[in-house]
Amino acid sequence: MQRKLTLSIDAMGGDAAPGVTIDGTAEFLAGRPEAHVLLYGDEARLAPLVAAKPGLAGRVTIVHAAEKITSDMKPSQALRRGKGSSMWAAVEAVKEGQADACVSAGNTGALMAISMLVLRKMEGVHRPAMTALWPTLRGRTVVLDVGANVDADAEQLVTFAIMGEAFARATLGIERPSVGILNIGSEEMKGHDEVREAHELLRNSPLKMDYRGFVEGDDISGGAVDVVVTDGFTGNVALKTGEGVARMLAGRMREAFTASLTSKMGAALAMSGLKRLKDFMDPSNVNGGVLIGLGGVSVKSHGGADARGFARACELAADLALSDYRTEIAANLARVGSGGLAAE
């Protein structure tokens, strides 16, 4: 028997909300018969959109929230003025036990700030981290932090490794995920003090982690490890660079295959392979960043995601809510506590 699941959704967040949000919710619910959704937002706008989709009857509950967090609102402003917003209400539902996880495609900084204030940090977590799933030659790799913290000391990097390992197990289905620290080289003497100290801490820790040492930038897309650990500044630059390269390649391929009649014929012959490549590179298939290390599940969908992309973010939230990844994180943080992080 499947466990019942409830998601709280900020229906007003995102570039094309609430239309895309409702469409994505419908797609998510079509594949999750055990799920129910709480939709937070302007009831007058949401009700007709929900009514137009018969599949949502009895599967969603609209909860009116008069305010909306705008895309240009600073995190500090969101904390001061956002309590009546759809985003705040969706996060609050997780805290109050009304929902198992929340999803928003709204303002990233605001969602992070509200989630940290409302859900609080897990015991032993000094700084939560933002995760991303990265397409690789081997499938998918978890990268964290990708923007929650501009810097991180050695012990925080170790915490990121612990959280990333549990996250990979829950989302990728890997029994013993491999973990590496992003560095400018694989040699032990490379990098700044923080990454070298974190390397020693992980290598000598009591954890049964499959720690592989340092990895380089090209190892991310190569799939050298299942979890890549870094600070938020480096991780965000890497993520945005990867997204830019993917868009550039897609554009160049489109130009190449439409440049002449011969190239168009070649594209027609290679259509099935090109479709597989397009699907692999489509960011909608890996949509959803998670602020990990909190007392509840908060998932950030890309603001420009289409319905399929938003549905993927909801699926990620559901998978995490049904997993015991936070219990694993707490247990491993306890194991390395009380002096267990002292490097030899």
Swiss-Prot record:
Pathway(s) per entry: Lipid metabolism; phospholipid metabolism
Top class in the EC scheme: transferase
Entry's EC annotation: 2.3.1.274
GO cellular component terms listed in the entry, alphabetical order: cytoplasm
InterPro entries xrefs: FA_synthesis, Phospholipid_synth_PlsX-like
GO BP terms, alphabetized: fatty acid biosynthetic process; phospholipid biosynthetic process
Subcellular location, principal: cytoplasm
Keyword Transferase among record annotations: yes
Keyword annotations: Cytoplasm, Lipid biosynthesis, Lipid metabolism, Phospholipid biosynthesis, Phospholipid metabolism, Transferase
Pfam families named in the record: FA_synthesis
Catalytic activity reported: a fatty acyl-[ACP] + phosphate = an acyl phosphate + holo-[ACP]
Localization of this protein: Cytoplasm
A molecular function GO annotation: phosphate:acyl-[acyl carrier protein] acyltransferase activity
PANTHER family according to UniProt: FATTY ACID/PHOSPHOLIPID SYNTHESIS PROTEIN PLSX, PHOSPHATE ACYLTRANSFERASE
Function as written in the Swiss-Prot or TrEMBL entry: Catalyzes the reversible formation of acyl-phosphate (acyl-PO(4)) from acyl-[acyl-carrier-protein] (acyl-ACP). This enzyme utilizes acyl-ACP as fatty acyl donor, but not acyl-CoA.
Family: Belongs to the PlsX family.
Subunit and partners: Homodimer. Probably interacts with PlsY.
Entry protein name: Phosphate acyltransferase
Organism of origin: Hyphomonas neptunium (strain ATCC 15444)
Gene coding for it: plsX
